[in-house]
Swiss-Prot record:
The keyword Magnesium does not apply. One of its GO terms (molecular function) is ATP binding. ATP binds at G170, R171, F172, F173, A174, G175, K176, T177. One of its GO terms (cellular component) is cytoplasm. This is Protein YeeZ. Residues 1-24 form the signal peptide. Gene3D superfamilies: NAD(P)-binding Rossmann-like Domain. Keywords: ATP-binding, Nucleotide-binding, Signal. It comes from Escherichia coli (strain K12). The keyword Transmembrane does not apply.
C-alpha cells in the first residue's frame, strides 16, 4: 500500500484524501485547527495540526508521522492579495525542506494559471509566465524553486478556476456588471483535479508541469448568465471592452497527450456543480 501526505485538507485536499483512501492509499493530512483535525479523523483520514505563522508550526512527532509517506501533495492556496505572500513562500519552502529531510521521493504542488497573468490567445505550459498579482508572482517563484530542487521529483499542476460543490459559478458575477463578455472561461471541475493528481501519483516518474483546465471555453457573456439563472439569481451584465484583447484560453491538453488523462467534465456548461 502506498502512502500519501496531503498538506491542506480543504476544499480540494479533503475530497482528494477521501478519494485516494477509497482507492486503497494510506492517507495522512494536515489541518490548521484542532477542530479541523478531529473532523478529518472522524472522516477516516489520519490528520495532524500544522500551521504557517509564517514559519512552519507542527509537533515534531506529528511532523514525522505526516511525512512518513511515498508522496507529498501540497494543496495550500496562495492568498489573492494582501500581506502574507512572503509568509506563504517561506512556509511552503520549509514544508518541502522537511519532506526532503524525510526522504519523500515525490512531490505534487498545485499552482494556478494566474502565473500567466494577462497573456492573450492560447496558453500552453511553454507560454512565458507574466503574473500580475502578488499571489501569482509568489507562485511563479515557488514553481522555479521547486523545479530546481535536487534529489526529488516535483510535479506542478497549474489549475484553472475551480468549480464544484460549494463553488457554483452562478454566484461569481450574479447581479453585477463585468468586463470582457466575449472572452472564454477557463474553469476545471474538482473531480478532474482529483483525477489528474491521482494519475500523477500512479505515473512512474514526475517532473511534469501541466495546465488543468476543461477543454471547452464558452464565452463569459453566455456562461455566467446561464449559471446565475440556474440558481434563480440575477444574471450579470457584460460589457465588451475594446482594449482588452481577445483574452486567454488555457490549453489543458498536454496531460491528455502525454499521460492519457481524460477530463470527466470537459464542458463547463454541463458540469455538476452542487
Amino acid at each position: 500500500m502506498k502512502k500519501v501526505a496531503i498538506v491542506g485538507l480543504g476544499w480540494l485536499g479533503m475530497p482528494l484524501a477521501m478519494s485516494l483512501s477509497a482507492r486503497g492509499w494510506q492517507v495522512t493530512g494536515s489541518k490548521t485547527t484542532q477542530d479541523g483535525v478531529e473532523a478529518a479523523r472522524m472522516s477516516g483520514i489520519d490528520s495532524y495540526l500544522l500551521r504557517m505563522e509564517p514559519e512552519l508550526v507542527c509537533d515534531s512527532d506529528d511532523l514525522d508521522a505526516l511525512m512518513d509517506a511515498d508522496a507529498l501533495v501540497i494543496t495550500l492556496p496562495a492568498r489573492r492579495s494582501g500581506p502574507g505572500d512572503e509568509f506563504y513562500l517561506q512556509a511552503v519552502q520549509e514544508l518541502v525542506d522537511s519532506a526532503l529531510a524525510h526522504r519523500i521521493p515525490r512531490i505534487i504542488f498545485t499552482s494556478s494559471t494566474s502565473v500567466y497573468g494577462d497573456a492573450q490567445g492560447t496558453v500552453k505550459e511553454t507560454t512565458p509566465r507574466n503574473p500580475v498579482t502578488n499571489s501569482g508572482r509568489v507562485l511563479e517563484e515557488l514553481e522555479d524553486w521547486l523545479h530546481n530542487l535536487p534529489g526529488t521529483s516535483v510535479d506542478i499542476l497549474r489549475l484553472a478556476g475551480l468549480v464544484g460543490p460549494g463553488r457554483h459559478p452562478g454566484r461569481f458575477f450574479a447581479g453585477k456588471t463585468a468586463p470582457d463578455g466575449e472572452h472564454g472561461v477557463n474553469l476545471v471541475h474538482l473531480e478532474d483535479v482529483i483525477g489528474a493528481i491521482t494519475l500523477l501519483l500512479q505515473a512512474p516518474k514526475g517532473g511534469h508541469i501541466y495546465n488543468i483546465c476543461a477543454p471547452a471555453h464558452p464565452a463569459r457573456n453566455v456562461f455566467y448568465p446561464q449559471m446565475a439563472r440556474l440558481l434563480g439569481l440575477e444574471p450579470p451584465q457584460f460589457r465588451n471592452s475594446l482594449d482588452s484583447g481577445k483574452g486567454k484560453i488555457i490549453d489543458g491538453s498536454r496531460i491528455c497527450n502525454e499521460l492519457g488523462f481524460e477530463y470527466q467534465y470537459p464542458d463547463p456548461l454541463v458540469m455538476p456543480l452542487e
